[in-house]
Amino acid sequence: MNKSVVIIGASGHGKVVADIIKKSGDEVVGFLDDNPHLPKELSGIPVLGTVGDYTKYKDFMFVVAIGNAEIREKIVGQLNCVKWYTAIHPSAVIASIDTNIGEGTVVMANAVVNAGARIGKHCIINTGAVVEHDNQIEDYVHVSVGAKLAGTVSVGKATWIGIGASVSNNLSICGGCMIGAGAVVVKNISEAGTYVGVPAERRLVMISINEKNQGGVCVECNAMPFRNGRCAA
């Protein structure tokens, strides 16, 4: 039976998730998003209202299409008693032996999830990413485009693995980390923070202060806000 899905997040990422849903033979009901400046449609898909309107659509399934793990987790906590949709692109290769993918997770085109891998809830396994055998991926992790995790890697909650990054086998990365684009992780990471380079090393983040609102913008992450004396990454 085909499923009908409401997407939280009307953005480029949301459009990719919508495409996965359609290619899986399911129906996209529309988007919910708190941005008041959105048009009534995005790529021909209706914008139904704000996130708070979700109660009108409780007969349908939901998926959160937002890249920021902190926001994704906050929204998941706001949506009570909904059914979560797990979006897996038809071209993704998912091993049939001892593999588990949590609810609300998105697995994009040409990604590979191998035998024995466990992926938590509301994760993003992006285009062409490789999650090798016996990986343990906790909730809200984002494995970016083309990133590769070798066998028996564990990744803690809400860690972001940047585009093209590589993680050697039998390693552990704690939660709350940002692994920069192209970084190569060759040893365990036990302290949350931003890690860049080959081999990946922790980098102290510079802060640029916005004079208008006295807020901070993390120079390392650019788009991610600086909150409570530390980078939100």
Per-range role (PLM):
Residues A18-I20, K74-Q78, I119-G120, S190-E191, ...:
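Short amphipathic alpha-helical segments
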Residues P36-A95:
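Phosphate-bearing ligand-interacting subdomains
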Residues R227-R230:
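Basic polycationic patches enriched in arginine
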Residues A87-R203:
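Structural signal for interior beta-strand "rungs" in well-ordered beta-sheet cores
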Residues A223-M224:
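Intrinsic disorder/low-complexity segments
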Residues H13, I71, V185:
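Short phosphate-engaging motifs
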Residues M1-L42, L48-K56, T105:
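Hydrophobic, well-ordered beta-alpha structural blocks that scaffold small-molecule cofactor pockets
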